[in-house]
Amino acid sequence: MRQTLRLVGPDAAPQWRLMAGGTAVLLAEVVFRVLEPWPLKVTIDSLVAALGRHTGRAPDTVSSLVGLGLALLVIVAGRAVCNYLATVAFALVGSRTAASLRSRAFHHVQGLSQQFHARNRSADTVQRLIADVNRMQEVAVTAGLPMAANTLTLLVMVVVMVFLDPLLAMIVLVAVVAFMLASSGNSRRISAASLRSRKSEGNLANTAQEALGAIKVVQAYGLEPLLHERFTGANTVSLSEGVRSRRIAARLERSTDVIVGVATAVVMVGGGIRVLNGAMSPGDLVLFTTYLRTTMKPLRDMAKYTGRIARATASGERVADLMAVKPDIVSPADAIVLDRVHGMIHFDHVHAAYEGRPVLHGVNLTVVPGEHVALVGPSGSGKSTLVSLVVRALDPTSGTVSLDGHSLDELDLRFLRSQASVLHQEAVLLTGTIRENIRLGRPDASDEEVEAAARAAHAHEFITQMPGGYDTTVGERGGTLSGGQRQRIAIARALLRDSPIVILDEATTGLDPASTSAVLEAIDELVAGRTTLTVTHDPQAAMRADRVVWIQDGRIRLEGSPQDLMESSAEFRRWANSHLADSFALVGSGS
């Protein structure tokens, strides 16, 4: 619970005025609850006294009854108004706090390294951002507020009962202590079971996301029974843990019923004896039993709310665990923002590791402004790791990567990444229109600039042939478009961004020859005059570069212009000809 309270503290603090107002009316509601039985007590004592004097109906007694009835109406109305205001105030606090926490958590997750996202399933992270925060908000309003009101009511009622009759009040205190003892142990067990349940729900979400995200493969290979079995297994685990927590909560509620029943019976018998002995009036007994009933209701409610709050606490711990992850890569305190970026990139004795495994070993490489360098070599040799260093998706374990003479870890991270356009093998588009996806490169771009970028990327023709043109809505991750179309839209986005550095990571891999040719033409437009690093297994893409760097086992093995390497390196020539025997037969024979 303390961890959850620390988590929401920064988000709840700006709502202090609402919380103060809500607390004030909550206290007023408790006062009205304390006052509510008094008209009934006075009425009973007045009637007993009147009946003891005579059997007639005294006018003053009738007027007193009317006044007491009106007083009760005022008290009930006041309590209702205060309850309404407190509910609204704390509902606003809960909603605003949850929205702030969700936004803060999403911003935090976006700033975590790619290694974090590779290690953690995205569906579980989404579950923490949405479902767990929602549960915290719901329980805070529907259980936290009533429990706070009940706790205040319980404390005030116990104090009042001690003043009314200390002996009978001891019975109530014993009942409260018995409840606290029963609650403390059960709360821990409910929290533990709820935490396991939330983890199981996260696994359930992961299983569903993986199956639906790869539905083409699932259906093509007939994997539906296998994945259904996995989903059912995860669903069963989630169900059993949820039932376990609710069973413990139900046990606590029934134990509380027994405690309340015993306390009520003892007070009823003991109070009746004290009335017969003249130690208290009938009105006092009614007042005391009313307070007892009012006091026991919070105990029953606390038993009911304890389980819900324990489950919310488990959700809070999951969100807190997520927020406790420290970003691996951050801007320095005195970050530098360059007035102008020329695009000189220098790797000086760079070593790098991924997931603890060494990948690069002492790489030295300089890319001059406007130069196009292709990085080739076997898979897993460190090419993608090398270009990841340029935008600080990863930091070297030793050595320095610099831009225009400044070490990257001296530069403002947001500024650094704004200076590079990155195209990956899978061009991911966001749900929305084609125009909106291109405009992500520069949100303030006009429609004319968006169209000009699409023309330069050789995307305008196929876009205008679509029913909605630039306003055609693409599906999730651009699934309604072909790979080549998605890549050309991504290139248009990069052209609109107009950054001095371009990074192409397997941008043509997996495309058919026609799409590859169209994408390569668009890439030529993109890289012109820009510092470019291209990771590729495609000789067509490599031969368009100014320089080719062969990386193997994390080290640079070959380096030179494509033409020089074709002439001087049998290894490079074999690689090129084996990939494009027909296209490069003429080039190879000329070496």
Give names to the regions the model predicted.
Residues 21-31, 142-196, 267-280, 287, ...:
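Transmembrane helices of ABC transporter permease
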Residues 338-591:
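ABC-type nucleotide-binding domain
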Residues 13-14, 114-118, 131-140, 144, ...:
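An intracellular "coupling" helix at the cytosolic face of ABC transporter transmembrane type-1 domains
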Residues 6, 17-38, 42, 72, ...:
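Alpha-helical segments in transporter systems
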Residues 19-81, 162-167, 278-282:
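Transmembrane helix-loop-helix hairpins at lipid-water interfaces of multipass membrane proteins
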Residues 223, 247, 294-322:
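Cytosolic ends of transmembrane helices, especially the final helix of ABC transmembrane type-1 domains
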Residues 1, 24-25, 32-48, 52, ...:
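Juxtamembrane helix-loop junctions of ABC transporter transmembrane domains
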Residues 72-79, 83, 176-182, 249-263, ...:
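Hydrophobic alpha-helical segments in the permease module
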